[in-house]
Amino acid sequence: MKTSVFFGTLAAAGLAAGVAAAGTLDDVKAKGFLQCGVSTGVAGFAFTDASGEWDGFDIAVCRAVAAAVFGDAKAVKFTPTTGKTRFTALASGEIDMLARNTTWTFSRDADLKFTFVGVNYYDGQGFMVPKALGVSSATELDGATICIQTGTTTELNLADYFRANNMKYEPVPIETNAESQSKYLAGACDVYTTDASGLAATRSTFEAPGDHVLLPEIISKEPLGPLVRHGDDEWGDIVRWTLNALIIAEEKGITAANVGDLAAAAGGDPEINRLLGTEGEYSSMIGLDAKWAVNAIAAGGNFGEIFEKHIGVNTAIGLARGLNAQWTQGGLIYSPPFR
């Protein structure tokens, strides 16, 4: 999901610069764990299971980074954040990275001073309505009441879309996905709008998901991905290349099941050898153990395995890969070369 840019948040930007200068990798190692900011809960993306353990598509990125740094995917603690609190938590150093359905935008980079290390889900804003409302297009929503998370790009996109289509709406402000779901199901709003993936995730938790419709319009680009503070390129490289390692692993057929065997000795693919530490001294370039990528992949699998386990077509959420397929399969998922 996205969270809005608060222009002029110079204090947050100053905090980010000061904290980053301290050296995040050293701080993380000194603590003995990674502190990862996540959402307050979105089915499939970030949730706690029956035993209270965090799991999900975004959670897997945090665990992969922990595994890359410590060799232990459990060396991570999670800080739930809302659309309003996530950026302050990152800028202040309360968290070491943010992996929380957050849209990469110009202002968040240039004004708030955050570095988006990549995209792990290409999304767009959509609309969900009760089937009983009898609406088949977002262009029929003139005068509707709409549940909208505050502090998000969703707010801005919604205003732009309705203005461009000469329509009016009444916003029903909410702060968390759980609050949105509760108010929407209680009839406090006609429509719920957020990232299409978030709508699918939310609908999957309903008692009667078939009673609710996702309208066909996608009104924005929402490249979602993990982010860190400006000013600490070493730490940014670690998080960036951990994500890239998961993407390369899928492209090359490296899985959680076979990564150990492939890393046991150099094989015929030079890029696999470089990634898994059997050729060259690449790990020293980012200050990690030679098996950092092996550990990251073993933690939860490659990018495709993580996607299919948590949000893919065989889950309750049922998302097709679409734009999030590998570039070789017509999607946008693509890593720079590991060389």
Residue ranges and their predicted role:
Residues 1-21:
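Gram-negative bacterial Sec-dependent N-terminal signal peptides
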Residues 22-25, 58-66, 84-87, 91, ...:
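Extracytoplasmic/secreted envelope proteins and their assembly/folding machinery
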Residues 23, 30-99, 288-293, 303, ...:
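Extracytoplasmic small-molecule ligand-binding "clamshell" domains
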Residues 29-30, 66-74, 91-95, 132, ...:
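Sec-exported extracytoplasmic/periplasmic mature domains
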Residues 35-44, 54-69, 103, 123-181:
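Bilobed "Venus flytrap"/periplasmic-binding protein-like clamshell domains
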Residues 37, 53-58, 78-82, 87, ...:
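Extracytoplasmic/periplasmic, Sec-exported soluble proteins
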Residues 60-63, 67-69, 132-135, 139, ...:
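Extended ligand-binding regions for polar small-molecule ligands
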Residues 63, 67, 71, 75-140, ...:
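Acidic, polar ligand-binding/catalytic clefts
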